[in-house]
Structures are given as C-alpha cells and as structure tokens.
C-alpha cells in the first residue's frame, strides 16, 4: 500500500481513507422482476427455495452498498425487488435519455448525488440487424445476426445487463467530476 501523499490534485493514493464515490452495479439476477415467477414454492419446489435464498444473499449484497461508509453513492439495478424491500429508486432512466435508442428502465438509488441530467434524448426505437424495429416496446437479447436468443442462452444475461455508453459517460461526467472540481478550488 502506498502511504505517500500524491503531488497531483487529481489523484488519491490509497491511505486507508474512505471512498469518495461508489457507483455500484450489483448483479440483478435475483432482484429483477423478470424472474419473479420462479419464486413460487408450490410450483417450483426446491428450485424456488434456492432462488429465495439467492435473493436474500443478493439483497444483503445490495444493502452493503447502501450502508457503505461513503459520502456519495449510486446503486444501479433494473426495476425489481429492491423498490419494495428497500425503497423506491430516486430516479429511473433509460439509455435513450443519453443517446442510445434503447428503452431499458434502470433504477438509481442515490445518496448525496444529483439526478442524472439527460444528455441526448433520442427516439427509443430498437432496430435490429434484419432492419426490424420494435419501437422500444420490448427488449430481446439478440445475437450478432439479429436472431432472438433463448432466455437460458448464456449470452442473454450479458446482453441484457449491458450498461450503454451514453449512460456510462453521463455518470462519469456528472458525478465523477464533482470531487475533481471541488479539489481544484483549493488551488485558486
């Protein structure tokens, strides 16, 4: 561990101090509403009991971010269980607010952070390789040729959990720069 202070105002060495900002993207597998049918114990038995246990573990992990010793926290997850268990999200965004023409509701739970300001609102059409447009009504994971993937295809979870570049840029620009600018004022 480096214990020397940095000479650069934009860089902090690890000195066992607190985080400045946490932007968390905890796994949504057991927290999203899309898998709710699998929690029916009468119908799915042991599989449902295991999912209930997995959801409890996922909630515990999510809450570690909520309770982290950090001044500024953002937790991202789709519409799901945490809006009922914990509290409603502070903001619900879509990639089309930030230049990516996709409708995908994403919840943000915030601590001492402003709401993300949309940077480039576009029409939420989903156009696939075959030219078919769904006007953002539904979002299906598709392969590189535009073919809809089965729900249990290993690529589906990765594709559906994608963080779009416009959203990532907005997070970095709007939340990541706050500490930099506040530190720079020390040198004026």
Predicted regions and their residues:
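Conserved active-site and SAM-binding loop architecture
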Residues: 1-188
